[in-house]
Amino acid sequence: VLGLPDHTVTVEVRRMGGGFGGKETQAAQWAVLAALAAAKTGQPVKCRLDRDLDMIMTGKRHDFHSEWEVSYDQDGRIAGVDIHMASRCGCSHDLSDPVNDRAMFHADNAYFYPAVRIRSDRCQTNTVSNTAFRGFGGPQGMLVAEQIIQAIAHERRLDPLDVRRLNFYGQNDRNLTPYHMQVEDFV
């Protein structure tokens, strides 16, 4: 912002605190404000948000809307899935692309899909940009898989645990992910 070489700038941080993601990209706006104020006044500047403002101004976990169709046999074994996810990214991309990609990569969770199509839309909105958050899209994708399993069990009046076991990845077959990676490690 000021065109200064990196070695001429000193930034002191009392402590970073817990959390994940928001400190990766979303601290830049506050650093810019502090830098401009320091350049204007010639004095060191401290910028500390109170918790309410911090919660309003910084990104959160991407919320997802998902729709899916599944085909399965009478025992609850999945034959194919078609999953469409949409996430609220906020007013800028931030880390939305990799978060959404990871949600798609985790939409199988621990289950084999013989036929699969997974799509994801990144929705730009007039809200604060969502960002990296623990799980980084994984929980959103895995939740879709669990919704599918629960729906099959409910529809067929089966024990959800039995439906889960029936659809787990296999050791010698049924072990290829939707993105063509062979599952080799089993517990």
Predicted regions and their residues:
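Structural alpha/beta core scaffold segments of enzyme domains
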Residues: 1-187
